[in-house]
Amino acid sequence: MSRHHSRFERDYRIGWDRREWSVNGTHGATSVCSVTSGAGGSTASSLSARPGLLPLPVVPSRLPTPATAPAPCTTGSSEAITSLVVSSASAATTKAPGISKADNQSQGLTTSIRWGQTPVNQSTPWDTDEPPSKQMRESDNPGTGPWVTTVAAGNQPSLITHSYGVTQPPTFSPAVNVQAPVIGVTPSLPPHVGPQLPLIPGHYSLPQPPSQPLSSVVVNMPAQALYASPQPLAVSTLPGVGQVSRPGPTPVGNGHMAGPLLPPPPPAQPSAALPSSVPATNGPPTTDSAHGLQMLRTIGVGKYEFTDPGHPKEMLKELNQQRRAKAFTDLKIVVEGREFEVHQNVLASCSLYFKDLIQRSVQDSSQSSREKLELVLSNLQADVLELLLEFVYTGSLVIDSANAKTLLEAASKFQFHTFCKVCVSFLEKQLTASNCLGVLAMAEAMQCSELYHMAKAFALQIFPEVAAQEEILSISKDDFIAYVSNDSLNTKAEELVYETVIKWIKKDPATRAQYAAELLAAVRLPFIHPSYLLNVVDNEELIKSSEACRDLVNEAKRYHMLPHARQEMQTPRTRPRLSAGVAEVIVLVGGRQMVGMTQRSLVAVTCWNPQNNKWYPLASLPFYDREFFSVVSAGDNIYLSGGMESGVTLADVWCYMSLLDNWNLVSRMTVPRCRHNSLVYDGKIYTLGGLGVAGNVDHVERYDTITNQWEAVAPLPKAVHSAAATVCGGKIYVFGGVNEAGRAAGVLQSYVPQTNTWSFIESPMIDNKYAPAVTLNGFVFILGGAYARATTIYDPEKGNIKAGPNMNHSRQFCSAVVLDGKIYATGGIVSSEGPALGNMEAYEPTTNTWTLLPHMPCPVFRHGCVVIKKYIQSG
């Protein structure tokens, strides 16, 4: 049972069941209620002094006692009536503040009325054991203002009027009228006991305040229609300030207020006197404001800042009216014979072109300063200028598809930058397959880069739809070639590009046939299907009549017929378009696989496309049992160097041609090696250290892929193998590795290619071996090694080393790459006995965490891993 329910059961249940109540709030075995009239008073007697029903809240001492007339009181009936009748003349004879508490007591409740929680008061339950009359003691709210009133409830059908006299405020205040909400009083009973009396509501409404000040504030509360409860008003203490909306307190059934009692108003600030039309606080907008919302903000003692947000709009409106009336204008613009009179300052504030033009004209003009400046403009339509001026003076303008291009051209020419952005935003939403090329040409002519890039990307993305429009047949030759030769042209079949070229030529063959070879070179003929090439392209009359066109077709035929010779046919026409399936992929090259306690070599080469999370097989390695090699990507090709096969250390260099999907032996290193590192710097491949025929080698050489030549550079200060190497900040770094004694080499070696010099530092923090290193966001990450999950991070700028987040698995002989701002660690082996790992995990620098990814085709270690752009055929 709740706290107030238990108190009810303890103190009030017996008396309630007996219905023995007295008019003054006490109860006993028997009760008699009598009222004796007196001169403005009444007397109530009782046979028992035992506490009874709780009275209504006591009016604080600051509120005088209302003068009451005799009222009948009946007992033994559920229709109890309490009435306080006050004449309008009695307000003048009320007592002043300071009367005794005995004179300021409430008449209480009549028979059969009890305190309790009603639905009206569910938001303010009792929080103490004190009854409401004690909770509302005068000492509890010493500063309560005269808004607290005493309310009596009854069901008398006649009009019940309550009038109270309030002391004269220190300064003049208009009359305040308060309309109280519905008041309900019901007993608080357990759920199984129904209420003994119906809800007794009291409904009050107030008339409008008088227009003249009163000598004292009088609150008149005649009974009105049901549920009329407008927001009460409170009087502001600021002199000269009208009524201010204030949420007044509302008494409810248990003596609590529906809203908190407001503190006394602050003392008057003489310096803050404002007209009644100006709000006194940062409240809601007033209907009296000329410009809508006005704000008054306190910025110090006696200081206020007034802000009118509608002021700029009103000023522009007035300036526009002056422009239309040609009042106070000082600039005349003549366009196509029409004269436009404007204000120089207004126009110069919106247009850099006119600002500079006006400044130069004023400096060069010999006219009197009182004469209007006159500008004559050509290459501009008068209607367009009128629309621009309308925007300058109002900040608004209607744009449609008919005038958008013209307005953008004029706004761009006269440097109305704000209006240019509006036009660009509008045209971006209006782009279609039928107008995107025209918008692209217009944006390029106006040097509007934002619109140009938007239109270009849009046109490239929907090429099949654009190719079906008439607009593409009307663009210039240069624009057409630039469009169809773009690598980002989104087409599933190169045959469509060829057909579009032929249509463009045949639109005006007399003029355009001479460009047939130049146009045909923009088509990727090697990617056209051989049957289409032989049956359609070869039989086209435009092709037959041009020797240059026939050469291009023959090149495509050789590409299909001689796949082994494709390496010598590297031209822009043999490069696939990006939309044709080219993606940046992670390639796994060879490696070792655990089969029980034995190992076997892998020749498979696979790639993973992160866009669709799929694995694709590539051309296998041309050798079988090779390990400890090194791979690196240069461009879109993969170079594999060195390694060991059947106990023999090798110097071979093989190249995987991404476009041709095959492996070729391209060169040999000057020093055979395995367990070495290779990387690319400035387009050249560097091979570092490793294990040679006679042990560790310190030899370093670089390979030029264009000239196919090797060149030796400065050797390593410390000969190591199985180290971690990467490029960062223009330097080549080699971390740790295995020294000649077969132990971890705690050394960091760095090489500067520009000066061909090495430097090194020894540190116990560097103890990695059989671990890869990658560069991300200016930091070097060393992953795993020695069967560990650790991640070591090196900062080249500060020269310090710190530990990073651990990987999910211990990885030795793993490989790592960087793709799309993430680090990918692939494969590896957990321990010398295995098992090999068949998964990847990615490092996200924003969250500094590692995440496991789907499994690879098979568990692998001692493999190569690189990133290239690869053409993935659909399906």
UniProtKB/Swiss-Prot annotation:
Residues 131-140 have a biased composition (Basic and acidic residues). Residues 270-280 have a biased composition (Low complexity). Residues 113-126 have a biased composition (Polar residues). Residues 329-401 form the BTB domain. InterPro entries: BACK (IPR011705), BTB/POZ_dom (IPR000210), Kelch-typ_b-propeller (IPR015915), Kelch_1 (IPR006652), SKP1/BTB/POZ_sf (IPR011333). Keywords: Kelch repeat, Repeat. Kelch repeats lie at residues 585-635, 637-683, 684-730, 732-778, 779-821, 822-870. Residues 113-145, 240-291 are annotated as: Disordered. It comes from the Eukaryota. This is Kelch-like protein 29.
